[in-house]
Amino acid sequence: MAKLFFLISGEFESLSFSELKAILEVEGYAYTVTEKLDQTVRLEADSESIKQVHRRSAYTRICAQELFTCPANGNAITKAANSTDFKSIIDEGATFEVRIRRIKEYSTKDATMTLERQLGKLILQNAKHAKVNLTKPDKTFIGILTNNKLVFGQKLAEIQPKPFVERRPRKKPFFHPSAMNSKLARCMVNLAYARENACLLDPFCGTGTTLIEAALIGTRAIGIDVQRRMANGAKQNLKHFSLNPEAIVMADARKLPLTHVDCVVTDPPYGRSATTLKSSTKTIVDGVLTSVRELLGKGQRICIASPKTIGIKTIGVKLGYRHLESHFAYVHRTLTREVAVFEKT
């Protein structure tokens, strides 16, 4: 197994960490977490696993092969860099750059730039055949300053934010103010252990955000909504991204016209802009957890979001699910979402 590290989002850090682990697990990669730092996860796993993290993750930013980790002081960094065989890493005549990311207040901007230059010089002393290229290098070395440490290695993949930005609710042809953002939806798809070619259900599909994120990683997506307008809008949005859902059906989430699915991801309606058909959010959550239970096999997962005040963990456990984890995502002053993951027992 290779020594790897991942720079994860600080937006919802616990979600980011759980998403990374879920991707490795659902794709069948054994791993050992060696250290969890602020926005940085060090672990040992097959380096091939990075391809799946890059393909699937919403909240991972950079994937890298670790070369060294040391205290974030000049002497320790110089010693660690001088002990690293850069000449065997950089091919003859190849170019490289060094980039340093600072997390929170663990460093200053000036210190970060100074460290980039310092490490560049140390690498050139070791690999005299190499050249620096800051615009289009053959290799990028990335360092993360966090928790008074420098985690340093070769960048293998970077997840660009632009595709997720292009799939924001207001960028889609059919918009509704209650729609979830694409990053959180993708993360929930991953937490539900959605596999390629597996069947994922969103019984409150709304504008189709979850269906889009599931389809983009090769999952067969089924959407259900009680409103014809929303079901048609979801179809319109998937078509906009050239995606074909398994099915989008107008039906009541409490009376699902299905016999089996592999996982469930959903964000039931709540708030002033959502249509709850005169039912309380707690009643809706209870109803959908009851109905989807009949569709899932033992060990299969549901990832569901609801207002923190609902107490979704208690509802799920009372209905016989095993509660695996919960995360809390602040939305605005009157709403903090609880993202809960359950397993059918």
Predicted regions and their residues:
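Class I S-adenosyl-L-methionine-dependent methyltransferase catalytic core
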Residues: 1-62, 69, 76-83, 103-115, ...
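A broadly conserved amphipathic alpha-helix scaffold signal in soluble, globular proteins
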Residues: 117-124, 190
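Phosphate-coordination loops involved in phosphoryl transfer and adenosine-cofactor binding
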Residues: 92-95, 197
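Short secondary-structure capping/junction motifs at helix and strand boundaries
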Residues: 95-97, 124-136
